[in-house]
Amino acid sequence: MNRSGISASGLASWYKIPPAQVLIVYDDLDLPFGALRIRERGSAGTHNGMRSIVQLLGHTDFPRLRIGIGNVPAGWEAFGFVLGKFEGAEATALPDVMDRAADCLTSIITSGMSAAMNTYNKTK
């Protein structure tokens, strides 16, 4: 979703949520499949959806949860990999990854960013 910023900024504006309180969850090619990483702020990197969000929120100072989907396999184009279906072991593991991501979000809300980072920013 290369235009994710339209939705994110629209919701933040509608609900009058400052960018620092908008938590973005997104897939990340630079993390191994299933790895979770929480950051309090940062650049968009190479993620087009995050570029859109940064541009339209006008900030990089917002928290985010990155969910690893692994590197693009040889012979694939990034967009085909990102938009494709999970198969094999990854498809089987995906429900557990999503459960851990949901638990991570709950931890951020109930225990705060630092505690969640200490728990979830570990190697998978």
Roles of regions detected by a PLM:
Residues M1-R41, M50-L65, V72-E77, G84, ...:
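Nucleotide and nucleotide-moiety/phosphate-recognizing core
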Residues A44:
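Conserved TIR/SEFIR loop-to-helix hotspot centered on a Trp-containing motif
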